[in-house]
Regions:
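Glycine-rich active-site loops that engage anionic ligands at enzyme catalytic sites
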Residues: 1-116
Length: 116
């Protein structure tokens, strides 16, 4: 059930192993082993930016709309990569990440705050 996946995913502490695939895409270690899942056989042509996904034993976050084959489990309103920002990537290798389940109202509020 999706509620169990969410509960297990937000219970873990993650560490950014590296950034790659696309600028700002974090490969996160610390996934509950029961949530590990293979990549899709047929990758999607468009994965929305902010999508939280699982690929094998790792979690990742798509920083922008990109093609991708990881299994999508959620999304974040946070912008992970902004060319004009200093530094341009919100996360770096070694950073710790903790996910939190939020409702649609809080999602929209955080999304709007990032545009200011």
């Amino acid at each position: 059930p999706i509620d169990e996946v969410i509960a297990r995913h937000v219970a873990a502490d993650y560490r950014v192993a590296m950034l790659g695939f696309a600028p700002g895409f974090p490969y996160l270690l610390g996934l509950d082993p029961t949530l590990a899942m293979p990549r899709r056989r047929d990758p999607r042509q468009r994965v929305p930016g902010g999508s939280v996904a699982i690929g094998g034993a790792q979690t990742g976050i798509y920083p922008d709309e990109l093609p991708g084959g990881w299994q999508l489990i959620g999304c974040t309103p946070l912008r992970l990569f902004e060319v004009a920002a200093k530094p341009p990537s919100l996360l770096g290798a070694g950073d710790r990440v903790r996910f939190r389940a939020i409702g649609e109202d809080e999602f929209r509020h955080l999304e709007a705050a990032q545009r200011r």
